[in-house]
């Protein structure tokens, strides 16, 4: 697996919401959905390499999937993992840019 494949297997998508927008403004933190097997070191390396920024800290949260029903059938959404990435002062990422 080359380095680009490794990066995109670790980082799945940025999470964009009111909460994440507030974190970006106040504490220079960005939130990404990451692979369930990704470690903090993997996330840090992937963000630094992909966006060419300096990462100060990474916090990771395991999010449990919700129980949902559809037409009287019970189902469960999958568990996923998100990473809060704090960048060094003066650096930023444009997560709304189109690929």
From Swiss-Prot:
Asked if the record carries the keyword RNA-binding, the reply is yes
Q: Keywords assigned by UniProt?
A: Ribonucleoprotein, Ribosomal protein, RNA-binding, rRNA-binding
| An example molecular function term from Gene Ontology annotations | structural constituent of ribosome
PROSITE patterns reported for this sequence: RIBOSOMAL_L23 (PS00050)
Q: Name one GO cellular component term.
A: ribonucleoprotein complex
| Database matches in InterPro entries | Nucleotide-bd_a/b_plait_sf, Ribosomal_uL23-like, Ribosomal_uL23/eL15/eS24_sf, Ribosomal_uL23_CS
Pfam families, sorted = Ribosomal_L23 (PF00276)
| Protein's GO biological process | translation
HAMAP family on file:
Ribosomal_uL23_B
Q: How does it assemble?
A: Part of the 50S ribosomal subunit. Contacts protein L29, and trigger factor when it is bound to the ribosome.
What is the stated purpose of this protein?
Answer: One of the early assembly proteins it binds 23S rRNA. One of the proteins that surrounds the polypeptide exit tunnel on the outside of the ribosome. Forms the main docking site for trigger factor binding to the ribosome.
What is the similarity comment for this entry?
Belongs to the universal ribosomal protein uL23 family.
Name of the protein in its database record: Large ribosomal subunit protein uL23
């Amino acid at each position: 697996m080359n380095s680009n494949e490794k990066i995109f297997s670790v980082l799945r998508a940025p999470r964009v919401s009111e909460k994440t927008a507030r974190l970006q403004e106040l504490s220079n933190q960005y939130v990404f959905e990451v692979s369930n097997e990704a470690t903090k070191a993997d996330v840090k390396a992937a963000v630094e390499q992909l966006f060419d920024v300096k990462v100060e800290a990474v916090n990771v949260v395991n999010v449990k999937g919700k129980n949902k029903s559809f037409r009287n059938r019970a189902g469960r959404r999958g568990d996923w993992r998100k990473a809060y990435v704090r960048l060094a002062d003066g650096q930023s990422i444009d997560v709304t840019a189109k690929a």
